[in-house]
């Protein structure tokens, strides 16, 4: 989904602030890019960015919301290095 459309979806469905929606989509797109290049084994869906946005609207920080919804997908014996990689991406935003 194009970035601007995903941002609009987040805003419409959750009433999240525009700047926060942009940050969430930027993080998601960075993870998606790493998935497409083979650096990660899983991608991020719009449903997951919506879940992050809902948590942010409910009072979570972006960092905590993305960590809870996205980073935790990579916690597994096989993906611990991916978890670390995703955490680094998140902290960069």
Descriptions of predicted regions:
Residues 1-93:
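C-terminal regulatory/interaction module of P-loop NTP-utilizing enzymes
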